[in-house]
């Protein structure tokens, strides 16, 4: 244990040397990489003893996942520092990008301090485990706990006086689970589309009302009455999950399609051109909302996936975007020198890179059928209201939202099986063709007969519906070939429509390395991180 701390202190000393010596170059960065590689190697051996793979539960799992996040962030910042140093080599003698270096060095320093705290907490937890705080549980984990507890009340059992105190404790726990569920949901509602906020609010009120009734009457009601009230609360929780799924997809189509309206490139151009304060404020507001929405998409994506590598990549992307969000606008506003412009270039490149990785990993875990279904709903509503929407330009936005489906099937993990199927390959090609045709006819400046536009949108709808059916068929055939058995427990019967149930515990690399192989278990994640360090150096 002491050796880990000593090695981590050595890493911190090297980073501090880079912060005070502004002429530190690649040799200094390689020195840090070597020291950090040694620490990571020692930690890997230590982790196997401290927390075997099958014992990564509770707070131990939380601390290990925090350590994985810090590893990934350190590696990300190393990559950006290497790029910064290489750019400095092309500048005039002695020119240094101090603001850029400071940004990434501060992030590495924070990660090293967090690593030290997490390693200590991990050791303490291995000696004497502590209960996991509800604040540390995800929406899905809280929902599973709440439904499992309700399941016990749905079964009528003879009353037992000796269990009264246990029952009282359990109802308190159930109420706490529901309250924390609502906290997660409210955070999501703050950035949800206006069209979803009203429905979400109504569902929250229903859940809280049913939970309050169940708690209020718990002690006075017999098991039969408790069962009836449990059966009322269960569907309210299912409704909450279902509508959050749908609202999450709506957010994905809006935030991932709306890259031009709130793009980092457009924001920089507007700030550089010194446009009116109203235009700047509007774009800044759009940008901030989009970043907040991406954060919520990431939080729920983490909740819906079980793969530790996927969670780590998403967390790292969110951490990078959050860190950049605080400094990228000032960097764009202060481009008064060539060095300031280089600083803005590096931050913009980093932001776009993290956003691309984030988008790809989200597409990796999304269920293709659920994504198509959501877009079909958007298309159907738009076709029904085409006369009102066409003059406002909304039909063009709807057609452009189809790019999210296009991007989804550009990834090998999502199209490999589809294009291997003759019908699937043909329908995918037809989808791409009609999508581009719909966008083209809506983008031209001359007026086009609305009937022609509706006809194309209906063709797009028909092709997508058939494509979804092919995806259904492929999933069914795979299930039959694998001789999959149906699950029986109450929580496993729920299928989270956001995440692809076929992913299991592996996922493609999402462009973090050149390899496309998936990691099959959690201990491989550290090896993955070490490979990244060796690749960089």
UniProtKB/Swiss-Prot annotation:
Membrane topology: Peripheral membrane protein
Keyword Membrane belongs to the record: yes
Cellular component per GO, a single term: cleavage furrow
Keyword line: Cell membrane, Cytoplasm, Developmental protein, Membrane
Places the protein is found: Cytoplasm; Cell membrane
Main subcellular location: cytoplasm
Matching Pfam families: Serendipity_A
GO MF assignments: actin filament binding; beta-catenin binding
UniProt function note: Required for the cellularization of the syncytial blastoderm embryo. Involved in the localization of the actin filaments just prior to and during plasma membrane invagination. Sry-alpha together with nullo and bnk may provide auxiliary functions, by acting both to stabilize a large and dynamic microfilament structure and regulate its functions.
Protein name from the UniProt record: Serendipity locus protein alpha
């Amino acid at each position: 244990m002491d050796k880990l701390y000593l090695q981590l202190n050595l890493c911190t000393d090297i980073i501090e040397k880079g912060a005070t010596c502004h002429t530190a170059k690649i040799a200094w960065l390689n020195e840090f990489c070597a020291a950090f590689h040694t620490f990571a190697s020692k930690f890997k051996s230590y982790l196997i003893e401290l927390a075997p793979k099958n014992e990564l539960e509770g707070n131990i799992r939380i601390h290990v996942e925090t350590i994985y996040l810090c590893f990934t962030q350190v590696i990300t910042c190393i990559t950006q520092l290497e790029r910064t140093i290489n750019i400095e080599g092309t500048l005039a003698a002695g020119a240094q990008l101090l603001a850029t270096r400071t940004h990434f060095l501060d992030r590495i320093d924070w990660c090293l301090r967090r690593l030290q705290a997490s390693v200590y907490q991990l050791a303490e937890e291995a000696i004497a485990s502590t209960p996991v705080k509800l604040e540390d549980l995800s929406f899905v984990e809280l929902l599973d706990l709440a439904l499992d507890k309700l399941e016990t009340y749905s079964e009528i059992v003879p009353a037992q006086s000796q269990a009264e105190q246990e029952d009282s404790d359990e109802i308190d726990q159930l109420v706490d689970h529901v309250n924390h569920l609502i906290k997660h949901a409210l955070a999501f509602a703050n950035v949800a589309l206006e069209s979803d906020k009203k429905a979400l609010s109504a569902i929250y009120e229903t859940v809280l009302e049913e939970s309050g009734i169940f708690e209020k009457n718990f002690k006075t009601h017999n098991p039969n009455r408790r069962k009836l009230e449990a059966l009322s609360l269960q569907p309210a929780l299912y409704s909450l999950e279902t509508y959050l799924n749908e609202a999450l997809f709506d957010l994905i189509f809006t935030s991932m399609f709306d890259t031009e309206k709130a793009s980092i490139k457009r924001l920089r151009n507007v700030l550089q051109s010194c446009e009116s304060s109203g235009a700047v404020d509007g774009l800044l507001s759009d940008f901030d909302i989009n970043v907040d929405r991406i954060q919520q998409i990431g939080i729920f994506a983490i909740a819906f996936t079980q793969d530790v590598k996927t969670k780590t990549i998403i967390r790292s992307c969110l951490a990078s975007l959050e860190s950049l969000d605080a400094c990228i606008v000032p960097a764009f506003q202060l481009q008064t020198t060539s060095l300031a412009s280089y600083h803005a270039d590096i931050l913009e490149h980093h932001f776009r890179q993290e956003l691309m990785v984030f988008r790809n990993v989200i597409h990796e875990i999304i269920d293709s059928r659920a994504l198509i279904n959501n877009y079909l709903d958007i298309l159907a509503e738009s076709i029904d209201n085409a006369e009102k929407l066409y003059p406002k330009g909304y039909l063009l936005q709807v057609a452009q939202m189809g790019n999210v489906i296009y991007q989804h099937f550009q990834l090998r993990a999502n199209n490999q099986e589809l294009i291997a199927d003759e019908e699937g390959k043909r329908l995918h090609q037809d989808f791409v063709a009609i999508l581009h045709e719909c966008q083209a006819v809506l983008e031209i400046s001359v007026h086009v007969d609305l009937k022609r536009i509706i006809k194309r949108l209906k063709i797009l709808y028909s092709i997508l519906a058939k494509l979804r059916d092919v995806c259904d068929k492929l999933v069914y055939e795979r299930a039959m070939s694998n001789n999959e058995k149906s699950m029986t427990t109450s929580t496993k019967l729920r299928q989270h429509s956001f995440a692809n149930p076929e992913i299991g515990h592996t996922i493609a690399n999402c462009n973090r390395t050149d390899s496309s192989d998936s990691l099959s278990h959690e201990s491989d994640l550290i090896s993955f991180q070490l490979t990244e360090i060796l690749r960089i150096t």
